Amino acid sequence: MADYLTVTHLTKYLKLKFDRDPYLERVYLTGQVSNFRKRPTHQYFSLKDESAVIQATMWAGVYKKLGFDLEEGMKINVIGRVQLYEPSGSYSIVIEKAEPDGIGALALQFEQLKKKLTAEGYFEQKHKQPLPQFVSKIGVITSPSGAVIRDIITTVSRRFPGVEILLFPTKVQGDGAAQEVVANIRRANQREDLDLLIVGRGGGSIEDLWAFNEEIVVQAIFESQLPVISSVGHETDTTLADFVADRRAATPTAAAELATPITKTDLMSWIVERQNRSYQACLRRIKQRQEWVDKLSQSVIFRQPERLYDAYLQKIDRLSMTLMNTMKDRLSSAKENKVQLDHALANSQLQTKIERYQDRVATAKRLLMANMARQYDSQLARFEKAQDALLSLDVSRIIARGYAMIEKNQALVASVSQITKGDQLTIKMRDGQLDVEVKDVKNENI
């Protein structure tokens, strides 16, 4: 009689076959994403073609490293291992790596992020800041060793000598590049002496330029209070930094030209033109005034000038007489008031009171002067005492009394415990110094 297997035994046997089959340990598979619903952690969906479907699992760590978002109906190429799930007897593929079919992962990530940021309004024209016409200092965020900074310096120096360039040395590709770009954009915005920023690098592959497609870089440029000119890659290269920047330049030279829209030559020509226009306007004004003066000089009043001031002379005479009479009246009134005041003072004995107060003031003055003299003598004595104390601490005066000062390695020696045999010492005396070598050390208290 034949032995019958249980479902469990058969399933375990098949699972063992799946697990040990080398062809199923690493499977290269292409298919269309189906039944995809994005989850917070692991992703579960199906891969299908025209004739078949297989369940797929992608762990959270793998999905996080994809660099693009899976979408329903997207065709992808995956690498993974096939496994059997015993409870249901179904098999699935555990995906270890995936990329879009027919388009690079970075290109897809670029399009997805561009779509997202466009929907959020990052690239709208209303957020663009105007570039200043005149600048005194330009910040440049790029590699210190590339051709970008050299081209910018050369172009700015040619167009408007005197404009300063402040370089923020920055890693522009590879791990950590995006973080450096963001940090330097924020550093530049903390300064008060910059007029605008140029952010850029030379050409390269999409991988080389990828730092300027990172969302954190787009966010930093969008939040910049300084106007930003983007100059990333060659003319045919386009990054998300170009879309969010206030202006995009195809080359570093073009970026420098945008930063200095008016050259020094343009400015000087404008000044000369304004000077000429002002000069011509002044000449016309002078000519008009001269014609007016000539016309006025031919009038009747200027041919008989005495008629111009006769009336004023008469008015002056009248005012003079009025003033003299007024002064006489006021002087007479003042004399009468003085007589009355003199009489009142004599009757009130005010003079006696004034003299008494003058005596009291004189006495107070003498006391004050005496007190000030005592204070001065006391302060002078304290000063002289302090001066003597300070002079007693003067090293040069101590040495002059016959003492010497010993130094070791230019440091003052205060005890024999600081000295060992063979040390080189300097002995300073009032009329010179000795350089000596210690032959022996003895400890003795004075």
UniProtKB/Swiss-Prot annotation:
Keywords: Cytoplasm, Exonuclease, Hydrolase, Nuclease. Transmembrane segments: none annotated. It catalyses: Exonucleolytic cleavage in either 5'- to 3'- or 3'- to 5'-direction to yield nucleoside 5'-phosphates. It comes from the Bacteria. It is an enzyme of class 3 (hydrolase). One of its GO terms (molecular function) is exodeoxyribonuclease VII activity. Its EC number is 3.1.11.6. GO terms for cellular component: cytoplasm; exodeoxyribonuclease VII complex. It is found in: Cytoplasm. GO terms for biological process: DNA catabolic process. Its main location: cytoplasm. InterPro entries: Exonuc_VII_L, Exonuc_VII_lsu_C, OB-fold_nuc-bd_dom. It holds the Pfam family Exonuc_VII_L. Bidirectionally degrades single-stranded DNA into large acid-insoluble oligonucleotides, which are then degraded further into small acid-soluble oligonucleotides. Heterooligomer composed of large and small subunits. HAMAP family: Exonuc_7_L. Belongs to the XseA family. This is Exodeoxyribonuclease 7 large subunit. The gene is xseA.
